[in-house]
């Protein structure tokens, strides 16, 4: 209605990915716009990495169930011994003049007390410097982290929730400051991002937003290939080839490059980086614009990914745009990351690779295609239609799952979709009531 408002949070960030020490260092300036009719005496900031801090309650909450009796040594091992040294380490929280701000940290949330109330239609800027150790998500779990390739000593990074982020303030509940323990997802405010990411010079990287310095981070030949991809609508064009990726993964450069991105009107920012990446792309024609469909994957993902990933991204954009609204951003990226299925604005992590013998079963093939369609589809819900995932997971999951079915059927005739038609809910609803889970919410 006429009284509707939404807050805005803008970020300027410089981030360093330290591959040798598996660590992120960052400094950010947040400019928070108060578009509400209320004066705000304090701000809530999300510290999602603290779900991995030693005092985190995540191990207790992540456990599916606890038996009636547990041996003492088993309880200590599962619920009290956390070997990974995770969580944000805050170096400073300063105002625009460089003076320290008063703040209190409560697990995964931080309240910053403002020197003077932030009045309606005003904005405030403050800076945070931080670092944290990156988790091996295949060992420690989580929606971001790194995947270790022991045979060649490389890592594939999928980095999200890596910076302190503004919590949502709205006209329904005020501050949405529910804790993040890993299971719930995210409630976020839209804003603009200017992000500089320093990584090893031999890494290939993609992220939310427009890459501002393509000619500085890709070779001249790779830039030409990308320009060709922008005009190619029928099949992906290899920007970084399998042979180039194989050669690069042996290098381990001690030099660095800075990748510069700008993203406008997005609710979050994420990136992926590795020297193992093959990179392909193709153009997708929508009703009002062309969009780039992009995939990043290691050689271990082939031949499956080069054959299907980018085409699945393209089909998702076509089907979802047909049934909802044209995709507003300029690209959508699918990244191969084993044991992942997670979405962020313009970029997502997806599982599915040939088995250890190089065999691709129908289960692996269709599972990979489906998760790509689903996670790319989350760009529409909740990345654009910005629902509160922390409180109401079903809102975006329900819409996305329905549209996923439509995209699967468009992608391939007789696609074996696991969900979609209404009759497929019958076995679930007619099953043992003791095992029916409640609607997805917190």
List PLM regions with ranges.
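Hydrophobic helix-coil surface modules that form long, contiguous segments used
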Residues: 164-175, 181-373, 402
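Catalytic Zn2+-binding segment of zinc metalloproteases
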Residues: 376-392, 410
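N-terminal, polar/Ser/Thr-rich
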Residues: 1-25
């Amino acid at each position: 209605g006429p009284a509707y408002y939404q807050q805005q949070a803008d970020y300027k960030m410089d981030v360093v990915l330290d591959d040798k020490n598996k660590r992120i260092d960052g400094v950010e300036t947040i400019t928070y716009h108060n578009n509400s009719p209320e004066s705000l005496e304090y701000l809530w900031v999300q510290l999602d990495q603290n779900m991995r801090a030693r005092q985190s309650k995540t191990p207790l909450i992540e456990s599916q169930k606890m038996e009636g009796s547990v041996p003492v040594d088993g309880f200590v091992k599962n619920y009290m011994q956390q070997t990974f040294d995770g969580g944000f380490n805050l170096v400073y929280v300063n105002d625009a003049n460089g003076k320290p701000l008063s703040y209190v940290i409560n697990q995964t949330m931080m309240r910053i007390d403002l020197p003077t109330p932030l009045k309606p239609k005003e904005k405030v800027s403050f800076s945070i410097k931080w670092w944290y150790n990156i988790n091996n998500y295949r060992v420690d779990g989580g929606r971001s982290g790194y995947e270790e390739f022991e045979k060649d000593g490389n890592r594939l990074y999928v980095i999200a929730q890596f910076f302190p982020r503004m919590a949502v303030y709205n006209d329904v509940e005020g501050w949405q400051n529910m804790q993040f323990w890993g299971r719930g997802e995210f409630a976020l405010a839209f804003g603009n991002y200017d992000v500089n990411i320093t990584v090893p010079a031999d890494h290939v990287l993609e992220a939310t937003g427009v890459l501002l310095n393509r000619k500085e981070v890709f070779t001249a030949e790779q830039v030409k290939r990308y320009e060709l991809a922008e005009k190619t609508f029928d099949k992906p064009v290899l920007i970084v080839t399998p042979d180039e990726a194989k050669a690069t993964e042996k290098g381990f450069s001690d030099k660095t490059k800075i990748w510069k991105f700008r993203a406008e009107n997005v609710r979050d920012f994420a990136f992926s980086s590795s020297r193992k990446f093959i990179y392909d792309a193709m153009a997708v024609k929508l009703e009002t614009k062309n969009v780039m469909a992009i995939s990043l994957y290691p050689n271990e993902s082939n031949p499956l990914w080069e054959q299907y990933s980018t085409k699945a991204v393209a089909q998702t954009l076509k089907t979802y745009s047909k049934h909802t609204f044209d995709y507003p951003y300029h690209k959508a990226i699918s990244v191969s990351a084993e044991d992942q299925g997670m979405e962020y604005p313009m970029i997502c992590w997806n599982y599915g690779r040939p088995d250890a013998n190089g065999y691709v079963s129908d289960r692996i093939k269709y599972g990979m295609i489906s998760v790509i369609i689903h996670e790319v589809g989350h760009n529409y819900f909740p990345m654009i239609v910005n629902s509160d995932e922390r409180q109401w997971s079903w809102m975006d999951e329900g819409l996305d799952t329905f549209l996923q079915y439509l995209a699967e059927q468009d992608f391939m005739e007789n696609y074996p979709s696991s969900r979609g038609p209404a009759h497929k809910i019958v076995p679930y609803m007619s099953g043992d009531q003791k095992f029916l889970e409640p609607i997805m919410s917190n």
